[in-house]
Structure formats: structure tokens, C-alpha cells
């Protein structure tokens, strides 16, 4: 017995008195048990009690089918709620209606959470979706889900509607399996009456037992035959019957949950589509764009993967490897007269034989066009180099590039670091680079070098005597099989105030003795008078015959022709001799003279460094030239 009123009860009494109701009328209304009991059974079912209704708790379950007018009849939003399933009890026979009311009243007296778990288990056992419960009872989908899954409190009127549906559904399912062989249902008119309200039918839903059987079959065979599908139908229906606690012979009682051959076929087709989609998604993710910033491949197809990268000096080479383009740098060579003398800005590039085809010698990036002409075409008709690799951005941005084109021989002079090129190119006069283009036929191909503020002058120098090598030393044994065999003579000379010439002999075996060095291109910077002093001379040297580094290749002893430029200081004349190292200098610049050799022949190219350690240069292992 409650001695004091709660705050809510006090507010309710105050509201009744303020509405104009007198105390006498209120007491008289409380003294009338009939109407008040039917109105107040909802709150009292939850344990709430008022002064005059404490002794009426035992009468709460009665009158479930009667009309109620308390706050229990309203929803959470305050709207009136009248479960339609409760009104349908009037359509049943008196015996059936009395039986259902008795069962529902017994469920209302039990723990709501225990009954909710029982209803949820029944839904899962028979693969009944909650949508069917919502359509039949008119309950809120979210409220029903929370009540069944979390035990959220539900008003008595709504629970009575849920329990009424539960009792009726049990009776319908039992009748289905009992009369499965007859193909008819006793409660069919009542069952059809409910779904027609929204014009919807129960959707087929795969049960856990059937899914387990189908997934095991999918692992064995992703596309079963018709006979295999029919076997799976029997297994699934048997499992569904066992799950529901009935005999497999009553499989027709599954109703809308009956497994058919068409449904099994659709299930396998959907699984195959899902697997194909996941595979495609995985392949798209795997074959996506690489995170690296480089747009081009790191190594071309014709590069040698076995070439050791440690052959270059790691102290000077910054990321320069065989088959890779180096970063473009600009080296300003100081001069004694003040100011930079020569600026060389060209990266080391590998030229493939396919890049030297006549159809691929046009370069729009270099703003040069090629045209056929006489022995010495004009400067405006120069051709540029092409390579399979994409050129670095720094190369396209700098206009001071040494562009050379020769069929079949091409080479490029790359930039050097100031620390390494400084001692080499420091002079008081103009500097000149002499590049030899070796081929079996005399050609006159112009070379332009727009370095600094002056235009380079081009002039070929013809040599009638061929050069015969007496030395052949391998440069890099791991890549000898990838290096082509072709004649080549490259001479790089630096003309200081007293001119000095650096020359070397080619290391090519089995070449023709005619027209080996038909011409040499001279690239001068500022002093054009130095061209007049260049005179070809012949010096004969006799040496013993040395065997080639490759078996089966021998060279006879023969005179060798060198290029001599008169110099005021003979001590500055340097000669490049063959060696096994890239350079005799302890520090080798990553940018210098590069020789390229095509891969369709079997020769070898070598490095001939300076004996005095003045020139810091290296020669690569490829020359785009074919002289077979």
C-alpha cells in the first residue's frame, strides 16, 4: 500500500482539479469499479497502482478483446492503436476464439522477455520474416525488432496483438504439415484474408540448413547439372523439415518455403555472378596505376637485367644506371676570362636500335625537322635522338642540348657535375669537343650545339686512313652477350689555350678495313679559328697481336691512325688507353661521353679512360650502329 502519492500522481490530480472537476465527482468516479477497471488494467499490469485500484490486479488479463480507452491504447506518439488482429477474433468460431484468448492471456502473465525470445526462435525456425508480423498485427517494425532482440518494453495491448498472431501462426503451420498430402489448408480463407490487405505475398527465404547444403555443393561443383540440382532440392527440403521438427514426408507443408529446382538454379547463378564480380574487383585493384611518380618503365625490354650497378662510382653516380635516364643537370664550366664558358645540359639516354629508324628520327620536342639534302644539309634540317624511354622533364625544359644524329652511329654527351668537370674544362680559350662518327660509308651529318650565348659551328674533317685496333678489352663481362659488334671510333678532345687532343682506338673485332673513320665532327664553341689548325696526320705503331676476349675472335697487328692537333704545350696531350675499369680517377662523373651500340650484332664497346686522371668520363655499353 502506497502511503504517499508520487509526483506524477500529484500532477494528475492537480490537472483533474484544474479542469473543473470537483473532489466529490472525482471520489464518486473512483468508487465506480466497472469502467475504471477496464481503463486502468494497462498501468496496473506494469506494477503501477493507484489508491482505489490496488485490489483489482487479478482481473487485468480479462477482457483482451474488449475496447479499452486508457493510455495503453495509444502509441508512443500518442496515436490511437487498435490491433486489427484482435477484431478478427469475432470471425472465428466461439470455441476457437475462446481457445486463442485463453492462450494469449496465459502468455501475457509470463515474463515478456522470455515470451519475446520464444517468438523470435519460432520466426527463425520457420524462416518467417518480421515483415509478415508487421503486416498482420500493424505493429511498428522498429519497435517489434527492438522488443524481440533487446527486450524493449511493449504495451500490453501490443503484446496481446503479437501473442495472438503467434498462437494463430502455430495453428496454421500445424495444419499445413498435417494436410500437406491433401494440398488444402483448413485455415486457408483466414490466411488469405490477411495478406490481401497490402496485396503482398510471403517472399521465399533460404534457411540456414539449406544454405549449408548449397555452399558445400558449390565448393564441389559451381554449375551442377539438372540431376544434381534435383538431388539438392530433396536434401534441402529434408533439412527444412527436420529444422521445423516435422517428418520429411511432409515437405509440402513448407508452403512458400518449399525448395524447388528453379530456386536452386538461381542460387548457383547468383553465387557465380558474385564470385566473378569479386574476382574482377580484385584484378582491378591489383592492376591499378602504380604509386610511383615515374610515368615510364624503369628498365626497357632490351636492357640487361644482370648488369651490376656497382660498376659506376657510387660517390659520383646519383641514380644513374644502365637502361635508365639520369636526372638532367647543368654544369657551368668556369673560365679564366670570367663568367661561364660552356653550359652542357643533356641527360644520359639509352638509344635503342628501333629508335634510330628513319621513321622515328623526328622529334617535335626538340623543334627540329629532318630533310634529305646534300653532303652537308643546312643546320635547320637536323634530326634528333629518340629512345624508347620517356625523357625526363628536365631534358625538355632546357634548350641548351647537344643534339646529334647519325645513321648508323649516334652518341650523346651528358652533363657533368661542376666538381668533376671543373678541372677538365678550365682553360683560357675556347673549348672544342671532337666526336668521331664511325661507319662503313662516308656520311656528313651535321651536329649542333647551342651552348651559352654563341652558336656552335659545324665542320666535318675527313680522314682517308682507317684505324685498326690492337687492343680489345672487355668492359663489363656480364653484358657481353647483349652488346652488339660494330665499328666505332670516338675521340673527345679538349682544346685549351694550347690545344690538347684526347683520342682512343676502337675495340671492335672483325670489321672491314675501308672507310672506318670517314669523318670526324668537330663541335666548337666560340673560337672558330681552331678549325683551321686541325690537320689529320698518320702515325704508325706496331704492337703484338692480342687475342680477343671473346673466343674465336682475333685481330691481326696493323697500323693505327691517330688524330694529332698541333699544340703549344705538348705536355697537355693525353691519350686514352683501354682498361678494365670505367675510369682511373677515384671519382667518376655520372655524366660524360656515352657510346651506344645496337643489339643486332655481336661486338663489344669498351672504356678508354685517361692515364693522367684529367678526363673523368665513362663510355656506356651500347652504340646504335650496325656495320655488318
Curated annotation (Swiss-Prot):
Residues 130-132, 143-149, 155-158, 203-206, 263-265, 270-273 are annotated as: Interaction with DNA. Pfam families: HNF-1_N, HNF-1A_C, HNF-1B_C. A motif (Nuclear localization signal) lies at residues 197-205. Residues 1-31 are annotated as: Dimerization. CDD domains: homeodomain (cd00086). Residues 47-79, 183-205, 284-338, 541-585 are annotated as: Disordered. Residues 288-298 have a biased composition (Pro residues). There is a cross-link at residue 117 (Glycyl lysine isopeptide (Lys-Gly) (interchain with G-Cter in ubiquitin)). InterPro entries: HD, HNF-1, HNF-1_N, HNF-1_POU, HNF1_dimer_N_dom_sf, HNF1a_C, HNF1b_C, HNF_P1. Residues 87-182 form the POU-specific atypical domain. It comes from the Eukaryota. Residues 324-338, 558-575 have a biased composition (Polar residues). It is found in: Nucleus. Transcriptional activator that regulates the tissue specific expression of multiple genes, especially in pancreatic islet cells and in liver. Binds to the inverted palindrome 5'-GTTAATNATTAAC-3'. Activates the transcription of CYP1A2, CYP2E1 and CYP3A11. Belongs to the HNF1 homeobox family. Binds DNA as a dimer. Heterotetramer with PCBD1; formed by a dimer of dimers. Interacts with PCBD1. Interacts with BHLHE41. Interacts with NR5A2. Interacts with SPOP; this interaction promotes ubiquitination and degradation of HNF1A. This is Hepatocyte nuclear factor 1-alpha. It comes from Rattus norvegicus.
Amino acid at each position: 500500500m502506497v502511503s504517499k502519492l508520487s509526483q506524477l500522481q500529484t500532477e494528475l490530480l492537480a490537472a483533474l482539479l484544474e479542469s473543473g472537476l470537483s473532489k466529490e465527482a472525482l471520489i464518486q468516479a473512483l468508487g465506480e469499479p466497472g469502467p475504471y477497471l477496464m481503463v486502468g488494467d494497462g498501468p496496473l499490469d506494469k506494477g503501477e497502482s493507484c489508491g482505489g485500484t490496488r485490489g483489482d490486479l487479478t482481473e487485468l488479463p480479462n477482457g483482451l478483446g474488449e475496447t479499452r480507452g486508457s493510455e495503453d491504447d495509444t502509441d508512443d506518439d500518442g496515436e490511437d492503436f487498435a490491433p486489427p488482429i484482435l477484431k478478427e477474433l469475432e470471425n472465428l468460431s466461439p470455441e476457437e476464439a475462446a481457445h486463442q484468448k485463453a492462450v494469449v492471456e496465459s502468455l501475457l502473465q509470463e515474463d515478456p522477455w522470455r515470451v519475446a525470445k520464444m517468438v523470435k526462435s519460432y520466426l527463425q525456425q520457420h524462416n518467417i520474416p518480421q515483415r509478415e508480423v508487421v503486416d498482420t498485427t500493424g505493429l511498428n517494425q522498429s519497435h517489434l525488432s527492438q522488443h524481440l532482440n533487446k527486450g524493449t518494453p511493449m504495451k500490453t495491448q501490443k503484446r496481446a496483438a503479437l501473442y495472438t498472431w503467434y498462437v494463430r501462426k502455430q495453428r496454421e503451420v500445424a495444419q499445413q504439415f498435417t494436410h500437406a498430402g491433401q494440398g488444402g489448408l483448413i485455415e486457408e480463407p483466414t490466411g488469405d484474408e490477411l495478406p490481401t490487405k497490402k496485396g503482398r505475398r510471403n517472399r521465399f527465404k533460404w534457411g540456414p540448413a539449406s544454405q549449408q547444403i548449397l555452399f558445400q555443393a558449390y565448393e564441389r561443383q559451381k554449375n551442377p547439372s539438372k540431376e544434381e540440382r534435383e538431388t539438392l532440392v530433396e536434401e534441402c527440403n529434408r533439412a527444412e523439415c527436420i529444422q521445423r521438427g516435422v517428418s520429411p514426408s511432409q515437405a509440402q507443408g513448407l508452403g512458400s518455403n518449399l525448395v524447388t529446382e528453379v530456386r536452386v538454379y538461381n542460387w548457383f547463378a547468383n553465387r557465380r555472378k558474385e564470385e566473378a564480380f569479386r574476382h574482377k574487383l580484385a584484378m582491378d585493384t591489383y592492376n591499378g596505376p602504380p604509386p610511383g611518380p615515374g610515368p615510364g618503365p624503369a628498365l626497357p625490354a632490351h636492357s640487361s637485367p644482370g648488369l651490376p650497378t656497382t660498376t659506376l662510382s657510387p660517390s659520383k653516380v646519383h641514380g644513374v644506371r644502365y637502361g635508365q635516364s639520369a636526372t638532367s643537370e647543368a654544369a657551368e664550366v668556369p673560365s679564366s676570362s670570367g663568367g661561364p664558358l660552356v653550359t652542357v645540359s643533356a641527360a644520359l639516354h639509352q638509344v635503342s636500335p628501333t629508335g634510330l629508324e628513319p621513321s622515328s628520327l623526328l622529334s617535335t620536342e626538340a623543334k627540329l625537322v629532318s630533310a634529305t639534302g646534300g653532303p652537308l644539309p643546312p643546320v635547320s634540317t637536323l634530326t634528333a635522338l629518340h629512345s624508347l624511354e620517356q625523357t625526363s622533364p628536365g631534358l625538355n625544359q632546357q634548350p641548351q642540348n647537344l643534339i646529334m644524329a647519325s645513321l648508323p652511329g649516334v652518341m650523346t654527351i651528358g652533363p657533368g657535375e661542376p666538381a668533376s668537370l671543373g678541372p677538365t674544362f678550365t682553360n683560357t680559350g675556347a673549348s672544342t669537343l671532337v666526336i668521331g662518327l664511325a661507319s662503313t660509308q662516308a656520311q656528313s651529318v651535321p651536329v649542333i650545339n647551342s651552348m651559352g650565348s654563341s652558336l656552335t659551328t659545324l665542320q666535318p674533317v675527313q680522314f682517308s686512313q682507317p684505324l685498326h685496333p690492337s687492343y680489345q678489352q672487355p668492359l663489363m663481362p656480364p653484358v657481353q652477350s647483349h652488346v652488339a659488334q660494330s665499328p666505332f671510333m670516338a675521340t673527345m678532345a679538349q682544346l685549351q689555350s694550347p690545344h690538347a687532343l684526347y683520342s682512343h682506338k676502337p675495340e671492335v673485332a672483325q670489321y672491314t678495313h675501308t672507310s672506318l673513320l670517314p669523318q670526324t665532327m668537330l663541335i666548337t664553341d666560340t673560337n672558330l679559328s681552331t678549325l683551321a689548325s686541325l690537320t689529320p696526320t698518320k702515325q704508325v705503331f706496331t704492337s703484338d697481336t692480342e687475342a680477343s676476349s671473346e673466343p674465336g675472335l682475333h685481330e691481326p697487328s696493323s697500323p693505327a691512325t691517330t688524330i694529332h692537333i698541333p699544340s703549344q704545350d705538348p705536355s697537355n696531350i693525353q691519350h686514352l688507353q683501354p682498361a678494365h675499369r670505367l675510369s682511373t680517377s677515384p671519382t667518376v662523373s655520372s655524366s660524360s661521353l656515352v657510346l651506344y651500340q645496337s643489339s643486332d650484332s655481336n661486338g663489344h664497346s669498351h672504356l678508354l679512360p685517361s692515364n693522367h686522371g684529367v678526363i673523368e668520363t665513362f663510355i656506356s655499353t651500347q652504340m646504335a650502329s650496325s656495320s655488318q
